[in-house]
């Protein structure tokens, strides 16, 4: 009875709109528009009973579908609105599908878009989404039509159409899960074409649709999809990254064939655990925890034997880090062999964000793998070595954090067996420091009790010449220093066992470094090495000086200007204060060997310069024990004098200059006694006097200073013949081109005259004195008044030696000088002297 009533009501409605239906075929577009509006007002807008609407819809559907091709946009828009309202209101919308779906497929699913209006295409897709929602599984027979439509609308130029199409795809996949897989792969390509759209909301919708398509698909396109999703993990939009995280987590939990894809899905989800946005990190961690728990339940029988000991954390677990659940750890462990090669590939990607995220992922994986890392140590180390040469600092820091976990979870005997070999023979000649860099990080993650038995092995490797002396790059030396520092901080007082080796390495770093900051850091480490043993740095050197000198002496015969040993010697002697004076019996043979005239010239210059610094402060260095005098005479005769012998060439001249500076320091520093010097004066004086004629101003200056120092020490003990050989050479220097040399020559002449004793017979040596006075009187008329003043003072000293001779010579030249002023002052001074005879002798 009710059906009859509904049929009658529907018939009445249809009669009322029959004229409007006829008008739909009119040529006048306004007529068609008004007809459609009237149909809408008298049907769906009238709130008729649903059964009545069902009957009316069945009769109106075909005419309405024809209107989808109406030339007038407003007519098409109204038509879609009417059909949409009918689908929403009728109890059995699926009855319209046989006519609706082919029409929509023809209009919106062809290769070329027939509908030019973006807004109408959007309304059509919204209508399609509603159809999927209300018809559900009834759409299964129209799988091809739906797929064709979505293939086109997903790549529609209008962003809103794309988004609505993606939502429709998700709904459709869930509505017909048993059939969707047959066409799912046809939607992958348009989705991947759209996944890089400029609008982030579109990208989010595409990712969500991709999740549904793969979830309910056959899995054939998983690899293509994953590569695109992996790129979206680096998206600038947090919402996009969050969508990827949610989709991947859902796959891990719910995809039918998820076990086959664990090794591909796990890296994506774990990458999000390191995301910069807390919300994404929390979401990823929660999904990962759920995946682990689910895996535990599904594999309970396999892991029940491991439950007891796998639940307790390993010793020395990183503080402040939450340990992942058993299921999560097992998931990583069982897939690690397939994950490590992927990490190795991506960590060298050309895109910086990819390398950064991959390096972050490595730490997360190792935190899950724990002691299972041991099984994959070789490829993991290769990854770390390669990544630590990256120019991006974040990549390097992340990899060093991962390396620290290796030290935490892998036993030292295992990682040292591989790593020390890599340190000895780096695989990359361009980046030889990476094994040291990784070793320092690994040692930093180790524990003191486990490292202690291996300290000797580590230190013996670091001190090897091919490790500590082979490379001079600052980066290499920094990493070598980092290895020493980490041992000092990790093992502290136990480093006393390897104190010598560590000191040797630190000395080598300082000797090879051209970077003042690095040298300063190495010196700080020397102080730390002292401190952990309860010593100061001087005591540390005292403890090891004998061994250090033996270490250097072993190779002294092969030293050259390029040998690091000469620089090591410099560092040791300059930093050890008074200690060298306690080991002269070992030090002096070493110095004798490397300073022989036949040895490398630049090396000798370097060593002489160093010795000059030490000898100037001999009481606090080489002569700290007062024993250097026992070696001084031999050092002077066998080392210094042979290096003062003249040889042609600039390099030979430079060696003589450095030897003169060392001689001067020896004379000034008080490390040689007057008696020792006097015994060698016959050999020494000719060489020093010869140096007064050197081309080098510095050599002439040093030679003058050496004569001055010699006269101070033994001037009063020299025989008159020795004295008479000195002054002619000094007189030549009064005409030197260097004012400084002239000044020192005058000072030395002053000392020469002051040092004359009663043993010097002025009458016997009158010709010498006459020549001396004549030359000095010439310079008394020097254009430089300051020189005149200094010469006057020297002549006043000479007036005490033979005043009458000087008076005669002064009177003879007085009238020849440009100004007699200084001559008059000299004569006045001589007149004021006590009465003397011509044969007066100095007192």
Which positions does each model-derived feature cover?
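Extended, low-complexity, acidic/polar intrinsically disordered regions
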Residues: 1-843
């Amino acid at each position: 009875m009710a059906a009859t009533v509904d049929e009658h009501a529907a018939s009445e409605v249809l009669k009322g709109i029959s004229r409007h239906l006829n008008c739909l075929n009119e040529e006048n577009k306004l007529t068609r528009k008004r007809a459609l509006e009237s149909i809408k007002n008298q049907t769906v807008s009238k709130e008729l009973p649903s059964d009545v609407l069902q009957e009316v819809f069945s009769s109106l559907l075909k005419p309405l579908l024809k209107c989808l091709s109406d030339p007038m946009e407003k007519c098409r828009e109204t038509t879609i609105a009417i059909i949409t309202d009918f689908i929403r209101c009728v109890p059995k919308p699926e009855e319209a599908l046989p006519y609706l779906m082919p029409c929509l497929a023809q209009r919106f699913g062809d290769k070329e878009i027939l509908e030019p209006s973006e807004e109408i295409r959007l309304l059509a897709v919204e209508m399609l989404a509603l159809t999927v929602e209300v018809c559900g599984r009834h759409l299964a027979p129209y799988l091809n039509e739906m797929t064709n439509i979505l293939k086109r609308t997903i790549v529609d130029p209008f962003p809103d159409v794309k988004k609505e199409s993606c939502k429709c795809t998700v709904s459709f996949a869930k509505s017909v899960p048993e059939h969707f897989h047959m066409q799912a792969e046809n939607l992958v390509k348009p989705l991947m074409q759209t996944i890089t759209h400029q609008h982030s909301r579109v990208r989010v919708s595409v990712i969500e649709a991709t999740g549904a398509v793969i979830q309910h698909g056959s899995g054939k396109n998983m690899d293509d999809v994953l590569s695109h999703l992996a790129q979206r993990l680096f998206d600038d939009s947090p919402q996009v990254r969050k969508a990827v995280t949610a989709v991947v987590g859902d796959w891990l939990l719910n995809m039918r064939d998820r076990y086959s894809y664990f090794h591909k899905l796990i890296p994506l989800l774990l990458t999000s655990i390191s995301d910069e946005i807390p919300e994404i990190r929390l979401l990823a961690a929660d999904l990962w925890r759920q995946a682990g728990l689910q895996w535990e339940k599904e594999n309970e029988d396999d892991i029940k034997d491991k439950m007891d000991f796998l639940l307790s954390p390993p010793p020395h677990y990183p503080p402040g880090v939450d340990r992942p659940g058993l299921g999560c750890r097992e998931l990583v462990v069982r897939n690690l062999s397939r994950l490590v090669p992927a990490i190795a590939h991506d960590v060298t990607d050309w895109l910086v964000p990819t390398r950064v995220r991959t390096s972050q992922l490595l730490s997360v994986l190792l935190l899950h793998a724990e002691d299972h890392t041991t099984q994959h140590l070789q490829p993991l180390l290769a990854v770390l070595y390669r990544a630590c040469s990256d120019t991006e600092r974040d990549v390097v820091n992340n990899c060093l954090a991962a390396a620290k976990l290796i030290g935490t979870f892998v036993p030292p005997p295992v990682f040292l067996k591989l790593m020390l070999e890599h340190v000895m023979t780096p695989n990359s000649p361009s980046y030889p420091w990476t094994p040291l860099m990784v070793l320092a990080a690994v040692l930093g993650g180790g524990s003191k009790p486990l490292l202690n038995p291996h300290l000797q092995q580590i230190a013996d490797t670091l001190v090897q010449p091919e490790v500590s002396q082979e490379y001079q790059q600052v980066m290499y030396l920094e990493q070598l220093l980092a290895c020493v520092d980490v041992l000092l901080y990790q093992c502290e007082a136990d480093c006393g066992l390897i104190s010598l080796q560590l000191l040797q390495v630190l000395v080598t770093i300082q000797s090879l470094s051209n970077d003042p900051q690095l040298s300063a850091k190495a010196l700080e480490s020397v102080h730390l090495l002292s401190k952990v043993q309860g010593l100061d740095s001087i005591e540390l050197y005292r403890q090891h000086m004998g061994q250090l000198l033996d270490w250097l002496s072993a190779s002294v015969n092969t030293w050259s200007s390029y040998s690091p040993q000469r620089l090591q010697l410099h560092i040791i002697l300059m930093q050890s204060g008074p200690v060298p004076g306690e080991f002269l019996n070992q030090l002096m043979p070493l110095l004798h060997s490397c300073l022989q005239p036949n040895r490398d010239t630049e090396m000798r210059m370097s060593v002489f310069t160093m010795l000059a610094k030490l000898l100037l402060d001999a009481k606090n260095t080489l002569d700290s024990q007062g024993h250097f005098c026992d070696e001084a005479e031999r050092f002077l005769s066998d080392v210094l004098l042979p290096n003062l012998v003249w040889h042609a060439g600039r390099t030979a001249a430079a060696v003589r200059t450095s030897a003169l500076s060392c001689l001067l320091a020896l004379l000034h520093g008080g490390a040689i006694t007057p008696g020792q010097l006097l015994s060698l004066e016959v050999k020494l004086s000719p060489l020093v006097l010869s140096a007064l004629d050197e081309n080098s101003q510095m050599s002439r200056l040093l030679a003058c200073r050496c004569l001055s120092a010699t006269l101070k020490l033994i001037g009063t003990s020299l025989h008159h013949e020795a004295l008479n050989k000195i002054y002619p050479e000094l007189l030549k220097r009064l005409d030197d081109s260097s004012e400084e040399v002239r000044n020192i020559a005058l000072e030395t002449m002053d000392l020469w005259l002051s040092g004359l004793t009663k043993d010097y017979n002025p009458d016997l040596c009158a010709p010498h004195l006459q020549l001396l006075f004549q030359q000095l009187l010439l310079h008394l008329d020097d254009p430089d008044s300051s020189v005149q003043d200094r010469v006057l003072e020297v002549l006043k000293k000479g007036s005490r030696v033979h005043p009458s001779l000087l008076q005669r010579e002064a009177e003879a030249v007085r009238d020849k000088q440009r100004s007699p002023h200084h001559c008059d002052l000299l004569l006045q001074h001589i007149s004021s002297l006590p009465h003397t005879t011509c044969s007066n002798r100095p007192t």
